[in-house]
Amino acid sequence: MDKFGDIRPYTDAEARDAFKRMADDPHIEPITNYIKPGLPVEAMRGLLSSLTSVWDFQHKVMYDVVTSIIRQTTAGVTYSGLENLKDGRTHLLISNHRDIILDPAIIQVLLYENKVHTTEIAVGDNLI
């Protein structure tokens, strides 16, 4: 097994299994009520069960969740430098590390809204 295998991002095949586990998890009801008030839990289960890729999850679930958090908890988000990202090249993006989960999620939204490929994120267990 790869040295970092336990913290690497899911492949699409692994993600499909994870989406089904999420749909069946007993915590899905309170999570749904929090992130999508008014959405019937069965609709969330159906959505999660229909996802086929990490991209689907980012586009159909997380985008709405993160933009809702931004609207409800900030006066706005500012950024600069996206014009420096070159297609086909890898880049390292660094935030000020206020929130180990939310910072990269907001970066994903900014990339998505600017039609830049989103990133893969791994979080070490020493940071959780």
Identify the function of each model-found stretch.
Residues M1-H91, H97-Q108, Y112, T118:
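Membrane-anchoring hydrophobic helices of lipid-metabolizing enzymes
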Residues H97-D99, G124-I128:
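Short glycine-enriched loops at secondary-structure junctions
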